[in-house]
Curated annotation (Swiss-Prot):
Pfam families found in the cross-reference section: ABC_membrane, ABC_tran
Species this protein is from: Arabidopsis thaliana (Mouse-ear cress)
TM ranges: 37-57, 84-104, 116-136, 150-170, 179-199, 315-335, 350-370, 427-447, 452-472, 541-561, 567-587, 934-956, 976-996, 1048-1068, 1167-1187, 1191-1211
Keyword field: ATP-binding, Membrane, Nucleotide-binding, Repeat, Translocase, Transmembrane, Transmembrane helix, Transport
Protein name: ABC transporter C family member 9
Gene giving rise to this polypeptide: ABCC9
Superkingdom of origin: Eukaryota
Domain annotation ABC transmembrane type-1: ranges: 314-596, 936-1218
An annotated Gene Ontology molecular function: ABC-type xenobiotic transporter activity
Length: 1506
């Protein structure tokens, strides 16, 4: 019925093929194209010479080089690239000259029937290659670094011409090869080498100077050149020859070392200069600026900048990818010819068979070389882009305005740096699929058309339909990806904030509440992940089933059209369908990567366009041109520019050089904002700010960097011992240094966590002093230090070493005001009063309220003192003796005492990493997490069934299809195709089952691992957080967890799938010719050897890469926290340089991991080609009849993919092992030693405990770690219930440690603490901490609202909350905001002043109403008036309760019932204030006298004491 139509189709197809062959054969197409090309080339060359002669063009840099060469005697060391180009050019020239000679003697038969065309073509070729050879020789004389662009273009065109014609004629020829064929083959191989040289472009010359040093001849700026040389000299890749780069043998020395012993960080070589972060960042910055100038802001400018940055390297990668895609289809193209040869072996020459085998092998080798180069090139480009993006995200973070900073938390920005950048660089790897996809599809369709005629159209339509299905799926996937990233941002933001404030959570017993908050955010992320993976599983099912669907549709169409399905045609089609799997499989990954990178790129583009600090906010003048250091005229400033009420308004300020200006005022009056206006940190709405001179800034909340104390003080400046000693002495740090383990080289933990508040404050004051600035801005510098230290700082630092400097200092301590040349009184964002101390007292419009509150406090001290004994005025000698006495009591709270100096104790340990092979227990832990590993055998069974059904369907088609068009099929085509379709459908269903099981198992495992790690971290003791940088934990929670969520299950699955596939392939090949096993076994042994040789090096490099990623994030988090200080000290460039160094430290192992993978893949591919070539030669050599040609063709079909499969197996195993490091790292944090249980069921206290509030310490000793000395020593005392106990002592005497012991933040190493007859070590931590109240030294607010911060457990009514707010003096401030209780609190409470934050913390304890309240410097950051009000409120609200107060303000503790004086971690005194004051020699008595003397000394008059 369909026969006529089918016959017509077959005839039409045959005619098309014949016409194409005639066009190439009978007409002299090659010769004519060749002549045109040579003439064009020669014309261009002559024009170029003429233009050069007349001086129109000039070789870039050549004259400069020649001038340099005249100055010194230099010889050129030749390179492999140059030698191969010269050899190949001369070889091709010789070949054409010899052919020309034979043509003269009529000794050669040409394919072209026109002798004129043949002769003209050879003459033009000879002339062209003569020119080329001469130019190549001249290159050496002129010492050119790169081959001229015209020469490289010529080599490229020659290869295309040779490959297009010669390769086809040689492989299609059935007769024995002649001289012309061998000449063409020689030319083709030489052109291939020249193509490689032209792509690289470099001659590879080195200059050999007379001194004997060898260095590359590079043109351009010499300074830049020196930088390049320093990188290149130690970079094996930078110094590698062309051959070493092709074979990746430049990395051999690293493998040799890694095989002998585990690699260390210093063993990894440097990267090439073009891969260095500095080079990449600078290049990308240029592109950003150029694009922004041309196109303006918007997301498009970011995309265009990236495109401009990557296009050159991406274009080279694209050339390799296109050649790779083209050569991959030569195998399927030749299969039909090979089956025909085997079927008609008697009538054909064996040479033809061997030539076909050589064609197969050559195509596979070219495919391997180009594939390895484009994959490596893509990874290298990804590395460069990652370095550029990370550095720009970092640089942007240093200049974000306050509004932008509030809208982007550090957790979000860390996500940009870790996750989003990774997704963009991953897309660079996938982008080459865009060029390869059309080539692969149309190459496949061409081969199918050649063998199946118009049936190929059915294949094309089906392929396009399958690909079209991806569009709606991709749009849906993009939405899911966007949801995943938003959910991940929310989780990381919360995690980052919790880690920073973990101490507060533990003190307040809120850890469970915030643990549940993270779990809720993770549940949201989990739901998004499950939707994405479920869709991905369905997409995979469609695309894995696609080749089977396409083949069924194509074969059915052929049957209906009457196209004969011979064995050769079917096998060629099956091989082509197999090749089509690559673009179809790759499409969802490409689209997924495209979607993910688009979402990530939009996020980064949006971030890079956020507003920055105003560059013109401050005018900087020279000191010589003005006597004013700071001047503000008619200034208005606001943290929220859109707000109707500015933060500061009507600011007029003139500060002369050398003046001391004090700024005071109530909490939230704008004192810190005034300093920010001088720094240019706050948005300027109007007015002028002028500053003349270098600035130094000390923020209210100490910002301390991880590192040594000396590093923090020097802050990038050179160490000058005399200046340094002077600074340290002025900042009262000498005694602390003596008592630190390593003096000023003692290492500080993250955010100075192992330092007391006073020590951190003095270290950052020393940092400012050492900079020798002209203007000093000190924000409440005395709040965290005791009375004696405060006086010492004021006298020796502010009035001593800084006496000639301009100093603006914010303070709540009135005793430091009289010495100021100018006092500014702030109120509601305005300067209400300005003048000297005496002038302001006389004005009676506000200042006297602050002074009055201080007077009251001082009066209370004096009255108690006088009632105890007669107060005597202290002389200067008394003052000196008191100071001397106080000095003897100094110690360091958190550090090692003098007797332990010799013992090194590093607080922040280097990140723990495993060594050697990843343990089996890690794999087992991962595989057996979900249902004890029950899903694993089902997944393997599903894949095995898929593979068996695939082989069965292909075997069925090869066995049943007739060997020739004339043969009769064994069964009807309808039945053949029905069985084939059923087998194909079965295999697709197996894929669906497998993908769903992998998605379920992988995500469930990831969720279990996350839950375990999260609970382990939350239950870790504070010592873990003290010694572990936040970035280290965040790295595991973001990057490593992302690997488990989306990659790990797929990578492990692919290990099993690829092994099953290769076993199936070997089975089919051994069925065809069992002799293949003879060669396969030793090759398999070689593969295993290579894999084992590779693994130790790659594993350690991967671990290093993972470890080196955390410092980038940690450094970034620290820099964001101290961005204001960095800008104030003008240290941006230094911090950016540190960031670039850290990026390079990560890039080094990462680059060598990528190189190592390519090294392995290249060698494994070559070994698999060896097996394939052996099997082909075996099939050609075996006598006819020994083997069925159709089955032999099936073996070749499977053999074509052997190299890919073999490389895939090893690649997947290595990749899975590298990814398994993330599992290993998460497991490490799932086994952190836990602190005591939250609840102990058998030992739960009564509901009303503690009802009395008595606290008994018995022989208490506390140390921070086993190798650290005791910080508290033999503390034995009792705090009676319902009493007020004051705890005093010099900075670092152990006061805060006592409180930490009370809350069991640190466990006693000896002794007990008993509260109301309950030993606190016997009850659960939650039962203990939830019954105690505390206002900590560092006030912490969480991202959210005021309501959430006051009542995070949602236990109280609005009425109760408002009552607490009014009591803690925040009622008016909060009512003034539109949102009231829902007023926004940003990360760290940055939009509230430090004093307001402390008042919110007070509100918490007023709500909690505990019977025991601890105040740890609770009012250090509020003014005296507010402090007085707060003390009254506490006395009223906690009248019959136990209140333990730590304070540096003596008046805060003078009215206590009992005072505990700590010194050197021991109890110095413990009695009532009155009794202690009766003893002249008591420590407390001396503290009181010191405070009185200080106030009296600085008042300068009796006004203060009246």
């Amino acid at each position: 019925m369909f026969k006529p139509f089918g016959f017509a189709a077959e005839t039409g197809s045959h005619l098309l093929t014949t016409q194409w062959l005639q066009l190439g054969n009978s007409l002299c197409l090659k010769e004519r194209i060749s002549i045109a090309m040579q003439v064009t080339f020669l014309a261009f060359f002559l024009i170029h010479l003429a233009l050069k002669w007349f001086g129109v063009v000039r070789n870039r840099g050549s004259n400069d080089v020649e001038e340099d060469l005249k100055k010194q005697s230099i010889t050129v060391k030749q390179s492999f690239s140059y030698n191969i180009s010269l050899l190949c050019s001369v070889s091709i020239l010789g070949t054409h000259c010899f052919i020309l000679l034979l043509l003269f003697r009529d000794s050669v038969v040409s394919r072209c029937d026109s002798s004129v065309s043949v002769f003209s073509a050879e003459v033009s070729q000879s002339f062209s290659w003569l020119f080329v050879s001469v130019v190549v020789v001249k290159i050496r004389e002129r010492r050119l670094v790169k081959f001229p662009w015209m020469l490289r273009s010529w080599w490229l065109c020659s290869f295309i011409l040779s490959f297009s014609f010669d390769a086809h004629f040689i492989t299609a020829k059935h007769e024995p090869l002649e001289f012309q064929d061998y000449a063409d083959l020689t030319g083709l191989l030489a052109s291939l080498f020249l193509l490689a040289v032209s792509i690289r472009g470099k001659t590879g010359f080195h200059l050999l100077e007379s001194s004997g040093n060898t260095e590359p001849l590079l043109l351009g700026d010499q300074t830049e050149q020196n930088k390049k040389d320093s990188y290149s000299s130690s970079s094996p890749y930078g110094n590698a020859t062309l051959f070493q780069r092709i074979t990746f043998s430049w990395i051999n020395p690293l493998f040799s070392l890694g095989y002998k012993r585990p690699l260390e960080k210093d063993d990894v070589p440097d990267i090439d200069v073009k891969d260095s972060a500095r080079f990449c960042s600078h290049a990308f910055d240029q592109k950003l600026k150029t694009t922004k100038e041309k196109e303006g802001p918007g997301n498009a400018f970011f995309y265009n900048s990236v495109l401009r940055y990557v296009w050159r390297k991406a274009a080279i990668n694209a050339v390799f990818a296109v050649v790779n895609a083209s050569t991959a289809y030569i195998g399927p193209y030749l299969i039909n010819d090979f089956v025909e040869f085997l079927s008609e072996k008697q009538s054909q020459s064996l040479n033809h068979g061997y030539l076909l085998a050589l064609g197969f092998l050559t195509a596979k080798i070219v495919e391997t070389v180009t594939q390895r180069q484009w994959i490596f090139g893509a990874r290298q480009l990804g590395l460069r882009l990652r370095a550029a993006l990370i550095s720009h995200i970092y640089q942007k973070g240093l200049v974000l305005s306050s509004q932008s900073r509030q809208s982007h938390t550090s957790g979000e920005i860390i996500n940009y740096m870790s996750v989003d950048v990774q997704r963009i660089t991953d897309f660079i790897w996938y982008v080459n699929n865009i060029w390869m996809l059309p080539i692969q599809i149309f190459s496949a369709i061409y081969i199918l058309q050649k063998h199946l005629g118009l049936g190929a159209l059915a294949a094309l339509v089906t392929t396009l339909m399958v690909m079209a299905c991806n569009y709606p799926l991709t749009r849906l996937q993009r939405n899911y990806q966007s949801d995943i990233m938003n959910a991940k941002d929310d989780r990381m933001k919360a995690t980052s904030e919790i880690l920073k404030n973990m101490k507060i959570l533990k003190l307040q017993a809120w850890d469970n509440q915030f643990l549940n908050k993270v779990k809720t955010l993770r549940k949201k992320e989990y739901d998004c992940l499950w939707k994405s993976l479920r869709l991905q599983a369905f997409t995979t099912f469609i695309l894995w089933g696609a080749p089977s669907l396409i083949s069924v549709v194509t074969f059915v169409t052929c049957m209906l059209m009457g196209v004969k399905l011979t064995a050769g045609a079917v096998l060629s089609a099956l091989a082509t369908f197999q090749m089509l799997q690559s673009p179809i499989f790759g499409l969802p990954d490409l689209l997924s990567a495209l979607v993910q990178s688009k979402v990530s790129a939009d996020r980064i583009a949006s971030y890079l366009q956020q507003s920055e600090t105003q560059k013109d906010a401050v005018e900087y003048c020279s000191k010589d041109h003005t006597e004013l250091s700071v001047e503000i005229e008619n200034g208005a400033f606001s943290w929220e520019p859109e707000s109707s009420r500015p933060t500061l308004d009507d600011i007029e300020l003139k500060v002369k050089s050398g003046m001391k200006v004090a700024v005071c005022g109530a909490v939230g009056s704008g004192k810190s904002s005034l300093l920010s206006s001088i720094l240019g940190e706050i948005q300027k709405l109007k007015g002028t700010v002028r500053v003349s001179g270098k600035q130094a800034y000390v923020p209210q909340s100490p910002w301390i960097l991880s590192g040594t104390i000396r590093d923090n003080i020097l802050f990038g400046s050179m160490y000058e011992s005399e200046k340094y000693e002077r600074t340290v002495k002025a900042c009262a740090l000498i005694k602390d240094f003596e008592l630190f383990s390593n003096g000023d080289l003692t290492e500080i933990g993250e955010r100075g966590i192992n330092m007391s508040g006073g020590q951190k404050q003095r270290i950052q004051i020393a940092r400012a002093v050492y900079q020798n600035a002209d203007i000093y801005l000190l924000d409440d510098p005395f709040s965290a230090v005791d009375a004696h230290t405060g006086r010492e700082l004021f006298e020796d630092c502010l009035m001593g070493i800084l006496k000639d400097k301009t100093v603006l200092y914010v303070t709540h301590q009135v005793e430091f005001l009289p010495a100021a040349d100018l006092i500014l009184v702030m109120q509601n964002g305005r300067v209400m009063q300005a003048g000297k101390f005496e002038e302001l007292l006389k004005q009676n419009i506000g200042f006297e309220v602050l002074v009055g509150a201080h007077n009251e406090a001082l009066d209370s001290i004096l009255s108690i003192e006088k009632s105890s004994r007669n107060f005597k005025e202290g002389s200067k000698d008394d003052t000196a003796s008191i100071a001397e006495s106080l000095q003897t009591h100094c110690d360091s709270e958190h550090n090692i005492s003098t007797e332990n100096k010799k013992k090194e104790a590093k607080l922040v340990q280097d990140e723990e990493t495993e060594k050697g092979v990843i343990g089996k227990e890690v794999y087992l832990a991962y595989l057996t997490t979900v249902k004890g590993g029950l899903l694993v055998p089902f997944i393997i069974l599903a894949q095995s069934c898929f593979q068996m059904l695939q082989i069965a369907s292909n075997y069925w088609m090869a066995w049943t299809a007739p060997p020739t068009a004339e043969s009769i099929p064994k069964l009807g085509m309808g039945r053949i195709l029905l069985v084939y379709a059923l087998l194909a459908a079965g295999s697709s269903l197996c894929v669906l089952a497998r993908t769903i099981l992998v998605a379920i198992g992988g995500l469930s495992t990831a969720e279990t691992f996350f839950s375990r790690m999260l609970c382990s971290i939350f239950r870790a003791p504070m010592s873990f957080f003290d010694s572990t940088p936040t970035g280290r934990i965040l790295n595991r929670a973001s990057t490593d967890q992302s690997v488990l969520d989306l990659e790990m299950a797929v990578k492990l699955g692919w290990c099993a799938f690829s092994i099953i596939q290769i076993v199936g392939t070997i089975f089919v090949m051994s069925q065809v010719a069992w002799q293949v096993c003879v060669i396969f076994i030793p090759v398999a042994v070689a593969c295993v050897f290579y894999q084992r040789y590779y693994t130790p090096t790659a594993r350690e490099l991967s671990r290093m890469s993972g470890v080196e990623r955390a410092p980038i994030l940690h450094h970034f988090a620290e820099s964001l926290a101290g961005a204001t200080t960095i800008r104030a000290f003008d240290q941006r460039d230094r911090f950016i340089s540190s960031n670039l160094v850290l990026i390079d430290s990560h890039s080094r192992p990462w680059f060598h991991v990528a190189s190592a993978m390519e090294w392995l893949s290249f060698r494994l591919n070559l070994l698999s080609h060896f097996v394939f070539a052996f099997s082909l030669v075996l099939l050609v050599t075996l006598p006819e009849g020994v083997i069925n040609p159709s089955i032999a063709g099936l073996g070749v079909t499977y053999g074509l993919s052997l190299n890919v499969l073999q490389a895939t197996v090893i690649w997947n195993i290595c990749n899975a092992e590298n990814k398994m490091i993330s599992v290993e790292r998460i497991l490490q944090y799932s086994k952190i030693p836990s602190e005591a249980p939250l609840v102990i069921d058998g030992h739960r206290p009564l509901d009303n405990w503690p009802n009395v509030g008595s606290i008994v310490f018995r022989d208490l000793q506390v140390r921070y770690a086993e190798h650290f000395p005791a910080v508290l020593k033999n503390i034995t005392c009792e705090f009676p219930g319902g009493k007020k106990i004051g705890v005093v002592g010099r900075t670092g005497s152990g006061k805060s440690t006592l409180i930490q012991a009370l809350f069991r933040i640190v466990e006693p190493s000896q002794g007990t603490i008993v509260i109301d007859n309950v030993d606190i070590t016997k009850i659960g931590l939650h039962d203990l901490r939830s019954r105690l109240g505390i206002i900590p030294q560092d006030p912490a607010l969480f991202d959210g609202t005021i309501r959430l911060n006051l009542d995070p457990l949602a236990q109280y009514t609005d009425h109760e909350i408002w009552e607490a707010i009014d009591k803690c003096q925040l009622g008016d401030v909060i009512r003034a905001k539109d949102e009231r209780l829902d007023a926004t609190v940003v990360e760290n409470g940055e939009n509230w002043s430090v004093g307001q934050r402390q008042l919110v913390c007070l509100g918490r304890v007023l709500l909690k109403k505990s019977n025991i309240l601890v105040l740890d410097e609770a009012t250090a950051s509020v003014d005296s008036a507010t402090d007085g009000v707060i003390q009254k409120i506490i006395n009223q609200e906690f009248k019959d309760r136990t209140v333990v107060t730590i304070a540096h303000r003596i008046h805060t503790v003078i009215e206590s019932d009992l005072v505990l004086v700590l010194s050197d971690g021991r109890i110095a005194e413990f009695d009532s204030p009155a009794k202690l004051l009766q003893r002249e020699d008591s420590f407390f008595s001396k503290l009181i006298k010191e405070y009185s003397l200080r106030s009296n000394h600085f008042a300068g008059s009796n006004d203060l004491l009246s």
